[in-house]
Amino acid sequence: MFRSIVVGTDGSDTATQAVRQAVGLARAVGANLELVSAYEPVPEQRLAEERRSAPSDAQWAIGPREDVDATLEAAAAIAREEGVEVELCPRQGDPADAILDVAEERDVDLIVVGNKGMTGAKRFLLGSVPNKVSHHAPCSVLIIRTT
């Protein structure tokens, strides 16, 4: 059936529901689980400005990559609670492309995504993820309907 499953997450409630469904399915069929989340790089100019204005011993603010690492760790905790081993796959760039790239590279059998993205300005961008994934996936796609 399914040997390897990819699930995309952005830390939203919808994505967390997709993670929970993917974890349950992976546990039921004994599949490997790959958790994918995308981040945007911090522009070099902004990094240089922050370095000039910050005291030398200051802690750097959490950046986009660190946010994704935390998102993936939170999703991994859900899987580990259920005894499912996971691989964390942070990727730079578009969320749908990140999911599709991992699915193709790892030759997975199933992609799991939520049907909605985050609210506000990000909703438009993230709402297109399930659509793009379902049209370009190299494998089956399970879109989790959420409220």
Residue ranges and their predicted role:
Residues 54-70:
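A short acidic, glycine-rich active-site loop
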Residues 3-55, 82-89:
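Small/aliphatic-rich secondary-structure junction motif
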Residues 1, 14, 28, 74-111:
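Structural beta-alpha unit
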Residues 110-135:
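Glycine-rich, Arg-bearing micro-motifs that act as flexible, cationic patches
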Residues 42-43, 96-98, 120:
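Generic structural signal for helix capping and beta-alpha/helix-loop junctions
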Residues 50-54, 105-107, 129-130:
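Short, hinge-like loop/turn segments at secondary-structure boundaries
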Residues 123, 138, 146:
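Short, conserved catalytic or interaction motifs in soluble domains
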Residues 37, 114-116, 146:
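Short secondary-structure boundary segments
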